């Protein structure tokens, strides 16, 4: 990529460092979209031994780019996101991608399409891990930062995304168990 163009796209991507997500970190501050994407990518790398048939490079790229559209729209929590929100993010991302040079433009467009369709192993792994990372982060945050509907989300969110994999289902089950322990502990403290 030409140097000036690289700096331009990096500047846009840098915005994700300042885009807050709904969830809090264990240190008590709002998590950024960049932090979520970073840990999602680590998760993909660290579970790759469970999926030797998956294209790890493609999976890592999916994880790295999956929320770039939020540099333009901010993060809208999944339980608030509407079809209109999704369309706006997709439109702005498509406009931005159109300005990329080849081969990055075509590769990223193909990756986004594959991620949306979720037919390939890599796309299914990415989406499952994306959901799981959010659940894990909620378990790591102070439960007093949870809103009421998150108690139910911690039990159900992502179940459909992990169903294709015994390993990811086991990970989801353990995350759910951690959520139950956290909720039970809060109940004990409030007595």
Can you annotate each of these PLM segments?
Residues 1-191:
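Active-site helical microenvironments for divalent-metal-assisted chemistry
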């Amino acid at each position: 990529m030409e140097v000036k163009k690289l700096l331009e796209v990096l500047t846009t991507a840098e915005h994700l460092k300042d885009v807050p997500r709904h969830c809090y970190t264990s240190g008590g501050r709002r998590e950024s979209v960049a932090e979520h994407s970073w840990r999602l990518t680590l998760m993909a790398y660290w579970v790759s031994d469970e999926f030797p048939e998956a294209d790890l490079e493609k999976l890592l790229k999916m994880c790295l780019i999956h929320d770039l559209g939020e540099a333009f729209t901010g993060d809208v929590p999944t339980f608030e996101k509407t079809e209109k929100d999704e369309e706006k993010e997709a439109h702005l991302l498509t406009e931005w991608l159109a300005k990329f040079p080849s081969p990055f433009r075509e590769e990223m467009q193909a990756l986004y399409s594959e991620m949306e369709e979720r037919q390939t192993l890599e796309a299914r792994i990415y989406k499952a891990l994306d959901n799981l990372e959010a659940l894990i982060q909620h378990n790591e945050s102070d439960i007093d930062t949870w809103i009421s509907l998150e108690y139910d989300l911690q039990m159900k969110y992502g179940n459909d995304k992990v169903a294709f994999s015994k390993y990811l289902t086991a990970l989801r089950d353990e995350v759910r168990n951690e959520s139950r322990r956290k909720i039970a502990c809060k109940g004990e403290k409030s007595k």
